[in-house]
Amino acid sequence: MSEISQTVPELVAWARKNDFSISLPVDRLSFLLAVATLNGERLDGEMSEGELVDAFRHVSDAFEQTSETIGVRANNAINEMVRQRLLNRFTSEQAEGNAIYRLTPLGIGITDYYIRQREFSTLRLSMQLSIVAGELKRAADAAQEGGDEFHWHRNVYAPLKYSVAEIFDSIDLTQRIMDEQQQQVKDDIAQLLNKDWRAAISSCELLLSETSGTLRELQDTLEAAGDKLQANLLRIQDATMSHDDLHFVDRLVFDLQSKLDRIISWGQQSIDLWIGYDRHVHKFIRTAIDMDKNRVFAQRLRQSVQTYFDDPWALTYASADRLLDMRDEEMALRDDEVTGELPPDLEYEEFNEIREQLAAIIEEQLAIYKTRQTPLDLGLVVREYLAQYPRARHFDVARIVIDQAVRLGVAQADFTGLPAKWQPINDYGAKVQAHVIDKY
């Protein structure tokens, strides 16, 4: 856990005074990664200038750069790395011209982020949590034993500061890297769906399930150890309450508790957010399949784009929410069977407008039953209405008729507890079970 004691102006002045700057285009970053990879194979962690030039040559070939100026460009790249404090150069009078290079902590940090930290490992996380649990238990035991100031610094503060806090930071870094990986998965899924969503469904499913499993593994591992870690932190906190001179330990324990709570909380929140995204993708796929069963829409859109310069067109929409959610229950009069062109009379009408118009007409016609106090047989009335509409709209029209009818009154036969008879309402097997409405 880093502790920044300087103020912002002090840090700015320090960075300006030392002329800190980092500029890593993709070729320079690739060179740094190549150096780090080769450096990892050295037992002594040292590299000669010739080895750096060889690494630069590999990068130059990969980027298809000219090989005629390889020496000059490699020398410039090495000097730039040294100037940016990514490499340390060591020279001696005995070996003039044969400098030795070592990666700096900054260089190791950057390459470690891109190389080693990209892989999530449940075993690694379990080992980290096991080490933290052991350190916390020993620190809690030492805190309960008590002792002088040296005892508290050596056996309590030091393990918390330089072991527990750093591992917490490592776990936090793992979570942040997984945040980036989630965003990359989202970008990959978007590209797959934009190219050919039918062929991409299986790939999307694989990406979604793998990411969900990784997030769940991480959170389960954290939650399993979280209670024990918090318990030991509370033991240390209780031991410091009777000592007024241990504010530094108490403050560190509070920071660790906050860090642990934040790690576990964000882990669960990340899972919840991913579940929401998972549902969104599946909903999009289902909607696309339902809308375009026969690829009519896709074919028409492709033709429209291809013939745009011959027959220009413009797309205008008034309700973005309806375009995003085509499976809204409020959108009645959907044609689930036919995916071709709409009739000319309905082509430019909103679904809700049609529903409202139809509901108003049916409400006005059914009101006659209430005015005359005439019994309303739902089975007969619904059948009469459905005869006026095509089969594809029978369900929506029947629902509107029934909704308007039950607002007028109730059937006294409903209170007898006896079930009503099933009555056919169209010639395709649809039936309704309802008593005659006779009390308005």
UniProtKB/Swiss-Prot annotation:
A biological process (GO) annotation for this entry? chromosome condensation
Is Cytoplasm included in the keywords of this UniProt record?
yes
Where is this gene product found? Cytoplasm, Nucleoid
Return the annotated region ranges for Leucine-zipper.
208-236
Q: Which Gene3D superfamilies match?
A: Chromosome partition protein MukF, middle domain (1.20.58.590), MukF, C-terminal domain (1.10.225.40), Winged helix-like DNA-binding domain superfamily/Winged helix DNA-binding domain (1.10.10.10)
Family matches, as InterPro entries: Chromosome_partition_MukF, MukF_C, MukF_C_sf, MukF_M, MukF_M_sp, MukF_WHTH, WH-like_DNA-bd_sf, WH_DNA-bd_sf
How does this protein assemble?
A: Interacts, and probably forms a ternary complex, with MukE and MukB via its C-terminal region. The complex formation is stimulated by calcium or magnesium. It is required for an interaction between MukE and MukB.
**Function description:** Involved in chromosome condensation, segregation and cell cycle progression. May participate in facilitating chromosome segregation by condensation DNA from both sides of a centrally located replisome during cell division. Not required for mini-F plasmid partitioning. Probably acts via its interaction with MukB and MukE. Overexpression results in anucleate cells. It has a calcium binding activity.
Name under which the protein is recorded: Chromosome partition protein MukF
Please name the source species: Salmonella arizonae (strain ATCC BAA-731 / CDC346-86 / RSK2980)
